[in-house]
Amino acid sequence: PRLLDDGYKVTVLDLYLSGEDVFAHYHKHADLREVKGDLRNQETVALALDGCDAVIHLACISNDPSFELNPDLGKSINLDAFRPLVEKSIEAGANRFIYASSSSVYGIKDEKNVHEEMTLEPLTDYSRFKADCEQILLEYQSDDFTAVTIRPATVCGYAPRQRLDVVVNILTNLAYHKREITVFGGEQLRPNIHIQDMVEAYLVVLKAESHQVAGKIYNAGYENQPVRELAEAVKAVVGTDVNLITTPTDDNRSYHISSKKIADELGFVAKHTIKQAAQDLVDAFEKNLLPDSLTDERYFNIKRMQSSDLQ
């Protein structure tokens, strides 16, 4: 929607596994073209890319649990379809390709500020294939084709295509509807970014001069906060009556990234707080924009994949 609002002509290629009403408010927009299809179908990809001068590649089987349900399916979409997509983009005349990777490619680091030049140590196939795609994309960087990768933190807040299976959104959903949230451990750091800031990061990279971003990789996050602080921020928004329970855990892994590079080079700094993300969700709950938010499978990637016949 932001691209349309900014005057771009937009083509969306998607399977619409979460429903075909994601762009309900924009279906009749003159500058929106929707192509329902599979990324692995080269004819469909060529159709979608026709006339495009930039590609923002977001499509994948997202998160480790969903990927592990069917590793062969995950590999076919997340890795095998990637090089053909890049090549088809070049054939179609696109001159910029922005890849949504993941901050999980770093694995577990002891350093306080995990930056883009650090060695990648992905722990799962999902993360490993993200790292592989980054390297594939760099092979195609040229004066005529600007290749850029963003490694986002975990996205939070309200969106038309809503996920309620990521940490801030999970906490807010449970706090609002159950009036109780449980934190396991609590000192583990988790990087997050508000959906509006995430969109802004893509726009900044899209609009930047080629010489600024060609072949570059950028982290994009807001803050690295302990899970306990995330829960307290959610409670402060939802209500003091929310019961916050802390229990011990054997999983004390922390994830933390530095977003200094994208700030220094492109001037992008995330501005929306965790409390704002929680408030956006509360507003959506109160307006009944997210019905059956505890049970509807469309909000939970793994449940949606379990019920899908995608092969």
PLM region spans:
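Glycine-rich NAD(P)-binding loop of the Rossmann-fold in SDR/ketoreductase-type enzymes
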Residues: R40, N70-P84, L120, T124, ...
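C-terminal substrate-binding subdomain of Rossmann-fold SDR/epimerase-dehydratase oxidoreductases
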Residues: R179, F184-Q311
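Conserved Rossmann-fold NAD(P)-dependent oxidoreductase catalytic core, especially the SDR/UDP-sugar
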Residues: H57, R83-D125
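Conserved internal alpha-helix within the Rossmann fold of NAD(P)-dependent oxidoreductases
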Residues: Q42, F82-L85, E134, Y202
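NAD(P)-dependent short-chain dehydrogenase/reductase
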Residues: Q135-R190, I195-L206, V234-A236
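N-terminal Rossmann/SDR dinucleotide-binding element
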Residues: P1-A54
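NAD(P)H-binding glycine-rich loop region in Rossmannoid oxidoreductase-like domains
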Residues: L39-I77
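Conserved catalytic-core motifs of eukaryotic protein kinase domains, centered on the activation segment
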Residues: V22-A24, P65-D72, I108-K112, P160-R161
